[in-house]
Amino acid sequence: EVIPVRSFNYRQFAVADYHRDHPEQPIIGTEMGSTVTTRGIYEKDTVRGYVPDQDITAPWWASTAETWWTLAATNDFWLGGFVWTGMDYRGEPTPYQWPNINSHFGIMDMCGFPKNIYYYYQSWWTDKDVLHISPHWNFREKGPGWNKPVGDSIDVWVNTNADNVELFLNGKSKGKKDMSRNSHLKWTVNYEPGTLEAVAYKKGKKLTKKIQTTGLPVEVVVTPYKTTILADGKDATVLNLTVLDREGREVPDADNMIQFEMEGPGEIIGVGNGDPSSHEPDKCPEGAWQRRLFNGKCQVIIQAGTKPGMIKFNAKATGLWNGGTDIQTISPESVAAINIDK
């Protein structure tokens, strides 16, 4: 009773008994979650060390996101909690060891690409309209994430803070469901290529979300976080790379090897793709930078040099149209002068 607030690291199953014995003492989750997921993977794979990208797997001492957050959100004696972790990190490979090189605990992967539990938390921690469907809807005979013959049953998850959702597969309704707060919705449907669409209503406002079976990749796309950085030898920008099919749709299961080239006053200082079992180097010899897409995504970090100018970045893959972007580096002195003028 000396402690004004009791903290729990996991062990959410013990909270009810503790609260019964200490009904006036507030509780905070100082370390919660440790849900394990692999971005873009929808079948357990013990050989490659992947777990499904759904809120269903946790070590015995931890919990799913929905389990701990529902407990915290629905009890007044809970002050909230801290999630382990925001992002995957090197070490602590759980629940597998080799060939894993990092954890699966993150709401996002090592590159900051969201996993599906990102949208669960976003649904209940923000006022933003959220409507998210998973899994993706691609079938490949040999894909990195998921193999399903036509007709096989698939659990389709929808994360949302809308009041209700109706799910359609190729225009045919699979049923309408009401959304319980702090939860998610799930339909079991038989796979067929095409379009999955969720139609939701939130306080009378209509929300829609579609995912489609894509074609094969034809084009590399580069999306920079910043297109202007300081020429101070320290500032950097992150470039996210994806590939599109002929209809301009992002291909979520692509695994193309992407090569990177750049010229100008800066350098590539690292690459990644969020794959917890990738043994590719994060740093490459000059002129040999490359990274394979992991479930459709990879990343490059460019750091500025000390001279102002234009960095020209190019990304290419065999058989695909190149992608690229320009990054302007500007002197810190010019920025300081602008700030003084203001």
What are these language model-derived features?
Residues 211-234, 333-342:
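Low-complexity, Pro/Ser/Thr- and charge-rich linker/hinge segments at domain boundaries
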Residues 1-179, 186-205:
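Extended substrate-binding grooves/exosites of carbohydrate-active enzymes
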Residues 191-195, 236, 308-310:
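Extracellular Ig-like/FN3 beta-sandwich strand-entry sites
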Residues 186-191, 285-306:
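Short, hydrophobic beta-strand segments
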Residues 204-216, 321-332:
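Edge beta-strands of extracellular beta-sandwich domains
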Residues 218-221, 261-280, 333-339:
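Short aromatic-acidic-glycine turn motif
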Residues 154-159, 199, 234-252, 258, ...:
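Beta-strand-rich structural segments
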